[in-house]
Amino acid sequence: MEKSIINSLLNIKEKYQDLKSQLNLPEIIADIKKYTKLSKEINSISEIVETFDEFLNLEENIKSSKELLDIETDAEVIMLAKEEISQAQSKQLELEEKLKVLLLPKDKNDNKDVIVEIRGAAGGDEANIFAGDLYRMYTKWCQQNNMKLSTLDLSPAVSGGFTLVTFSIQGEKAYSKLKFESGVHRVQRIPVTETKGRVHTSTATVTVMPEIDDDIEIEIKKEDLRIDVFRSSGNGGQSVNTTDSAVRITHFPTGIVVSCQEGKSQIQNKDIAMRILKSKLYDLELQKKQSEESGYRKLAGSGARSEKIRTYNYPQDRVTDHRIGYSTSLNYVMEGRLNPIIEELLLEEQKEKIAQAGI
């Protein structure tokens, strides 16, 4: 392995050990935000350190076996030592390739939690119903993958489903796993209201935004905001429908409008709405940067939220992700089993990064 890569790995290992020691400090243990942030940072490099340790152990084994060859005269022992060296060197090559991939530039948002927004788009009532189906799909995925989903805002549609649903997902590498869900999701099926058995095509849009943390400063001027309160129709508790607890915030420079009525008070709803607004503003900046990065094209496409990424074909029990040409069972996916698609998308992202790095 190149000396420059070895040096980088040694630096990462030193950083890892330093972070681990900080995790036991009383002031860190007492501060849940600092403890969580530090834990995420440790987790982000733990696989690199573990793989490098395995590589170094093999290096020691190879060295010991070679020293044995210098003094050993027994033919059988020599043969076994040579086999061990060969196997260890082969494994080392595998680990070397793995380490090169692990050292590829990381998306700085990959470890962040996310805010997800689903809207019924083209197709009227059927689009809203499909938006509800997608919401349930992600809910099931969270339950299966130790993720916490919290509903932030709901706008139920008269015919069922939602015109808009906004929710947060918290868990390990939530953004890394879900960032490629953004885009237009198309459904092909016979609506329950269809009397002639014709297949209709409808769409819902999904937007996945990293939830910003204390490390990111988003400047929002008071004069750029209009804050309206209105009577909630959500699940906020006893105050629902009796007080103006729901909050809507309009950001004049961008035209972004966010609302929240799922909290138990106006103050809580305002805080949640500001969280959503900050994530939306941060996401706008990300989209601008991604549109300038040619290597991001295949998975993120043009970067536009209007790009069709996936089709859910009910008559044929098939879901197809158009960016990677991957198809699987629709029933399987709608039950929340998204991981095979997610893994294929992450593999494609890895291939793009390798091509960019010239490895």
Curated annotation (Swiss-Prot):
Annotated signal peptide: none
Post-translational modification summary for this protein: Methylated by PrmC. Methylation increases the termination efficiency of RF1.
GO cellular component: cytoplasm
Membrane spanning stretches: none
Keywords annotated in UniProt: Cytoplasm, Methylation, Protein biosynthesis
Top-level taxon in the UniProt lineage: Bacteria
UniProt KW Cytoplasm keyword: yes
Residue numbers carrying N5-methylglutamine: Q238
Molecular function via GO: translation release factor activity, codon specific
Family matches, as SUPFAM superfamilies: Release factor
Principal location class: cytoplasm
One Pfam entry name: RF-1
Location of this chain's protein in the cell: Cytoplasm
Similarity-based family: Belongs to the prokaryotic/mitochondrial release factor family.
Protein purpose: Peptide chain release factor 1 directs the termination of translation in response to the peptide chain termination codons UAG and UAA.
PANTHER family per the UniProt record, alphabetical: LD18447P
Family matches, as NCBIfam families: prfA, PRK00591.1
Protein name per its UniProtKB record: Peptide chain release factor 1
Lineage of the species this protein comes from: Bacteria, Bacillati, Mycoplasmatota, Mycoplasmoidales, Metamycoplasmataceae
